[in-house]
Amino acid sequence: MLERAQRTLKRKVHYSGVGIHFGKSATLTLEPAEENTGIVFYRSDLLGDRIPALLPHVCNTGRSTTLSSGDSVIATVEHLMAALRSSNIDNVIVRCGEEEIPIGDGSSHVFMQLIDEAGICTQNDTVPIAKLARPVYYQTQDTFLAAFPCDELKISYTLHYPQSPTIGTQYRSFVITEESFRKEIAPCRTFALYNELCFLMDRGLIRGGCLENAVVFKDDGIISLGQLRFPDEPVRHKILDLIGDLSLVGRPFVAHIVAVGSGHSSNIALGRKILEELQP
């Protein structure tokens, strides 16, 4: 059975910023936690319930991933969760003073900086690294995801945006390690199509969106502060989102994930199927 030592943070760290969808400023605090705590969210502005970062607590997947417990809700957790998962951090208390995690620059970069500032502490207890008993898949319309037994965590993603010549069809495949995530995936920002913006605003979303935290694709060009960080930054960001969503399985696992056009809803659906087939 594969296993490794559990890990937490060495010290408490803070970050203040705005949420991309609700546009509210909030302070985020990451705190060390005891062994076998898991990743747990608290709303520091409420005397509410603890919100474990687990699939049963997912309550909304519209343009981001939202968790809830009782009356407590915390939105847009995926970029933070991707950073924690890829850094092999098992136990941490996350406190947020609003209903949405601050977006930073739209990537996982700020959360990797927080983890570096806090430092990582190895704990005494171990955690098993689970494997898939058999392949699983999820499909709906033009979206397809599958997970195959593998001895490492690998993600292969195909993104197809025929409505955007600048994005077009992109494909990337990475073995996910702390190093590969930090260098190849964490800097990649969230993005939207220009013709989606009115629709999103009409739904009360992206109130905190701006060119400091997102890339907008318009016709055959981009609207951004500076150039793309990678020529295929959109597909890399989709891999970032997928890592964050699948971290809600709540257990370290290895598999080869193949995804075509997936989003938060389908990522979570695959996560539930993976959880059913993990061993031990």
Swiss-Prot record:
Catalytic activity entry: a UDP-3-O-[(3R)-3-hydroxyacyl]-N-acetyl-alpha-D-glucosamine + H2O = a UDP-3-O-[(3R)-3-hydroxyacyl]-alpha-D-glucosamine + acetate
Organism domain of life: Bacteria
Cofactors: Zn(2+)
Pathways per UniProt: Glycolipid biosynthesis; lipid IV(A) biosynthesis; lipid IV(A) from (3R)-3-hydroxytetradecanoyl-[acyl-carrier-protein] and UDP-N-acetyl-alpha-D-glucosamine: step 2/6
Assigned keywords, A-Z: Hydrolase, Lipid A biosynthesis, Lipid biosynthesis, Lipid metabolism, Metal-binding, Zinc
EC id: 3.5.1.108
Record's keyword annotation contains Cell wall biogenesis/degradation: no
GO cellular component, one term: membrane
Residues binding Zn(2+): 79, 237, 241
Family matches, as InterPro entries: Ribosomal_Su5_D2-typ_SF, UDP-acyl_GlcNac_deAcase, UDP-acyl_GlcNac_deAcase_C, UDP-acyl_N-AcGlcN_deAcase_N
HAMAP family associated with the record: LpxC
Descriptive protein name: UDP-3-O-acyl-N-acetylglucosamine deacetylase
